[in-house]
UniProtKB/Swiss-Prot annotation:
The entry's keywords: Cell membrane, Membrane, Signal, Transmembrane, Transmembrane helix
Name assigned to this protein: Uncharacterized protein RF_0090
Protein topology in the membrane: Multi-pass membrane protein
Organism: Rickettsia felis (strain ATCC VR-1525 / URRWXCal2) (Rickettsia azadi)
InterPro entries according to UniProt: Conjugal_tfr_TrbL/VirB6
Residues in the signal sequence: 1-24
UniProt superkingdom: Bacteria
Family listed: Belongs to the TrbL/VirB6 family.
Basic and acidic residues biased stretches: 633-647
């Protein structure tokens, strides 16, 4: 009797253990699955939920690596006779969740959120996996290893020569409006792919008439072989001289020769194999490992140091610790992009979020008064334009239009001139930086030619000229950045005076961004309230607008604080005009200071937009005079002669600049 009871207890324990094992096995895969760094997909999405309802390691599953299909067990509804249903799918097969969960399970097949998700069997590296779409691309939910190494999938030809940051770089920025940092990173990665990484595009089909040209990296490889052969000949000639002349056999000359030869070889053709990449021996090139990162990293580092010492307290100062490794240079460009949005009235940057776009803040930055600014227009006045309620609108131009409708044409003209000059100067800095970066990459690409020239007395001048251009292009953006930092400091002081700013940090998935709320200082709050920036913020929020009839149509305009706004804006305009004329010579000043080439001929002129506006105004004036039967300004002989003389002087100055560059090049090429 005791034996029978003992047997029953043993059977019950076995059944319970098998049952527990069958349910506890859900979520197990034959091969380990990739995980995200933040664990977001595995814990907070349907992806992780579906993983926890699939079993492959249970005896009903199949981890056989020799089979060309994948077998898995899909969990059934609680209380079913079987804990899960076994399915066998071949590569390329697809099934919806509703097709796999046919028992009307409210947690899976009957769930309106999950039922239409498609699971597809695909090869994933060396595994065969059940893959589902996610917010971060297709991800495997169950995998098994393959006994044979699968044939490599053909590379995707799309964007094979364009940097990945060109379409994902915005995720590394902390500014809501970002384009300059994206442009810099996109160009940097693209140049690296074109010049050094090689052509990753697959070859054309045999029937195609398109012929792929050899990649730049292939040509440089051939060039390095030629330079290597020349260095071997150089070593042989030195050995001959040492054997024929005892002066060359001195310890000092031999040591100097060895040091120079190793440095030239390391930075021109590379030494190796010194390391292994992907199991293949690779050469280590000093110019690519140290020279290029140093030259391209010096400009943003110097410029950012200058920017950190400029500007208002707290405005557009992002948390550098939140930038990912390798993308900290975005801090410089985010500061520029942020100010463009702030000066032009991007409401979200002011932390004005009436539409709930930003979400909840996850933190605050240091500085700023704890007392927030008054809640302007809490109920939404009828007098304000509808454009002020749109998220992401540049409200500066809407406010300028409000002044125009009130007849304040001078304020409109001053505001437009300020915005045009400000954007022109920033555009010049961005293009100047990009041109210098392209020059550095080109100089690095042709470095195998110029670096060995340091070995010979007659060609040493060519190496000095090459080195001078590299160093100048690394330092010129820092000089221009100092000018931009001074400009921004003057603008911040003139527009916001002593106002303070409190940073709000937000995070949505992998994207982190910040806003800056204007705060009144603890002392001297009246001065901040009288500033142009504070009053513009009132207009952005809907204060100060009035609605009245113009003939038969209702219009909305601004008639409040017109005199003070005009005075403050004229002060800003004075600074703009001063910097406008100074910006004409900043390029030449930077080139003279760094003893390098002048980049103004290949960059966007800081006065280009203003010059186009002036030409347009002159054209309209001439057209108006012609319509009245009067001779245009261009037809007057004296003025026309002056115009031609000015053009001739401009041409002479340009040719003089070109001659200076030619003299510099000829000086670099000659001996000292």
């Amino acid at each position: 009797m005791k034996t029978l009871k003992t047997l029953k207890i043993f059977i019950i324990i076995c059944i319970a253990s098998v049952s527990l094992a069958s349910f506890a096995g859900f979520g197990e895969s034959c091969s380990s699955l990739p995980t995200t760094s933040d664990g977001y997909l595995e814990t907070d999405t349907a992806y992780g939920y579906i993983i926890r309802n699939i079993d492959m390691k249970d005896p009903r599953g199949n981890c056989n690596s020799a089979a060309s299909s994948i077998t898995f067990c899909f969990k059934n509804i609680e209380g079913s006779s079987s804990p899960c249903t076994i399915y066998n799918l071949n590569e390329g097969d697809s099934k919806k969740i509703s097709d796999l969960s046919t028992d009307n399970n409210p947690d899976l097949g009957a769930n309106p959120v999950l039922k239409d998700i498609v699971l597809t069997v695909k090869k994933w590296d060396n595994d065969l996996c059940l893959v589902m779409p996610t917010s971060r691309g297709p991800m495997p939910v169950a995998c098994k290893s393959l006994s044979a190494t699968p044939t490599p999938t053909p590379p995707d030809d799309e964007n094979c020569n364009i940097g990945k940051s060109c379409y994902t770089g915005a995720n590394y920025s902390q500014s809501l409006i970002n384009f300059s940092g994206l442009a810099v990173q996109c160009l940097s990665e693209t140049l690296n792919k074109v010049f050094f990484a090689g052509n990753s595009c697959s070859s054309q089909d045999q029937n195609s008439r398109i012929t792929n040209l050899a990649a730049f990296s292939t040509f440089q490889g051939y060039l390095k072989r030629i330079i290597g052969a020349a260095l071997i000949l150089y070593t042989m000639f030195f050995a001959f001289n040492m054997a024929l002349n005892k002066e060359y056999a001195s310890t000092e000359k031999i040591a100097l020769f060895v040091i120079k030869f190793l440095l030239v070889a390391y930075f021109s053709i590379g030494l190796g194999p010194l390391d292994f990449s992907g199991g293949q021996p690779t050469k280590e090139n000093g110019m690519l490992k140290y020279g290029l990162p140093l030259l391209t990293g010096a400009a943003p580092d110097f410029a950012q140091m200058i920017f950190n010492a400029a500007g208002s307290r707290g405005l557009c100062q992002f948390d550098n610790s939140k930038y990912k490794d390798g993308y900290k240079f975005y801090g410089l460009w985010d500061a520029i992009d942020c100010r463009i949005g702030y000066y032009l009235g991007l409401d979200l940057l002011y932390n004005i979020d009436k539409n709930g776009v930003l979400g909840n803040s996850i933190g605050n930055g240091p500085g700023g008064n704890n007392t927030p600014i008054p809640n302007f227009d809490p109920d939404g006045k009828k007098d304000r334009p509808k454009d002020l309620s749109k998220a992401g609108a540049l409200r500066f131009f809407a406010v300028m239009f409000g002044f125009f409708m009130a007849g304040n044409v001078i304020i409109l003209a001053a505001g437009l001139v300020f915005s045009v000059i400000f954007l022109s100067i920033l555009l010049y800095f961005i293009t100047h930086y990009l041109v210098c970066m392209i020059t550095i990459y080109v100089m690095t690409y042709i470095s195998p030619i110029f670096i060995p020239m340091a070995l010979f007395t007659r060609t040493k001048a060519y190496f000095d000229g090459w080195l001078k251009v590299c160093i100048s292009c690394a330092l010129q953006p820092a000089v221009v950045a100092g000018f931009i930092a001074l400009l921004i400091t003057m603008y911040d002081s003139a527009i916001f005076k002593n106002c303070e700013f409190l940073r709000y940090d937000y995070e949505k998935g992998d994207i982190r961004f910040s806003t800056f709320e204007l705060r009144l200082p603890n002392g001297g709050a009246d001065k901040c309230q009288e500033s142009f920036g504070y009053k513009m913020l009132q207009y952005y929020a809907g204060e100060g607008w009035e609605e009245h009839l113009l003939i038969l149509f209702p219009i909305k305009s601004i008639v409040k604080d017109v005199v003070s706004i005009l005075a403050e804006l004229l002060c800003v305009l004075v600074f703009s005009v001063i910097f406008y004329y100074f910006s004409k010579s900043i390029g030449r000043f930077a080139s003279d200071l760094t003893n390098g080439p002048n980049m103004d001929a290949v960059t966007a002129s800081p006065t280009k937009i203003v010059d186009l506006v002036k030409k347009g105004a002159a054209f309209l004036k001439d057209a108006a005079m012609a319509s009245q039967g009067k001779p245009s300004v261009g037809d007057k002989p004296d003025v026309g002669g002056k115009r031609k003389e000015g053009e001739q002087q401009g041409g002479d100055s340009e040719s003089g600049a070109g001659g200076g560059l030619a003299d510099l090049a000829s000086g670099s090429g000659g001996g000292k």
